[in-house]
Structures are given as C-alpha cells and as structure tokens.
Amino acid sequence: MKSIYAFEKSVHPFSDVMGQTVSVNPLNKKWTDLFVDYPILKETLDGLDNDGKGHCVISREMIFREKDCRRKAILTLLWGFPRGYRNSKTHKNAVKSVVEIAEENNDKNLTPEMFKFMIGKAGVGLSTLSKILYFFEYKVNGNPAL
C-alpha cells in the first residue's frame, strides 16, 4: 500500500486554508460553566475578535501562531468543538486534559508511548487528539500529523 505522501503532488492545496475560521458563542453554557475552574478559557475568549454578532472568531493561522501552550490548547478545543461536547463531564475532562497535554515538554515527535499517554487522558478521543497533533505540529515517523 502506498503512503499518503506518494500522492502529495496530486493534491492541490486549498487557497488560504490558514484564513479559514470558526465562530464560537462565548456565552454558550458549556463554556461559561468552566470559567471558574479554567480562567484561561474566559481569558482566551475575551481576547478574541468579535464577528459583530457576539461570536468570537478563530482562524487556523491564529492557532498556529499562538506561542502560549495553554492558550493554544484552548483555541484548538474551541476550533474543533465550537459548541462544546454533548456531555458536560466529557467537556470538562477534555479542557483539563488538553491543557495537561499542551504543558508536556517534548520534541513533538509522536512515539507510541506518547500516543498512549495522550489518548489515555479523560475526554480525549481520536477527534480531539488529531486536532492537538495537527495544531501543535507533531510529527509521526518524521511526517507532519494530519
């Protein structure tokens, strides 16, 4: 079976993929309920541009450029789940876990042990983890995580 990288030249990149945005309602109860435990969440939402309808706007470029790991983790979660998770316990666990993962110091080369550690965190499934790996620019066997 060919590697996905064998098709790299066949795939045409989208124009301005970094400019893609999502809107997040900062008053969504699933987010506001976590402000007390995670002030970084409120600080992050308060610092975002507003779309004129009261929603915060997050772009891919903004997430990639963010240098603060905790804030980047929150932006990644907001990007991937702008309406929050269905289950409030999972939602709270995911916020806690992505912040913990972001604070881990490593060389961004994903090892099987790191993968097990990350996927073992409460509230972190493959969907959440894939976003963390992508926005934090992890590599798998020397290749960028998709």
Question: Predicted segment positions?
Answer:
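An N-terminal alpha-helical hairpin/helix-loop-helix interaction module that forms a charged
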Residues: 1-119, 138-146
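Active-site acidic-Proline motif in GNAT/NAT acetyltransferases
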Residues: 122
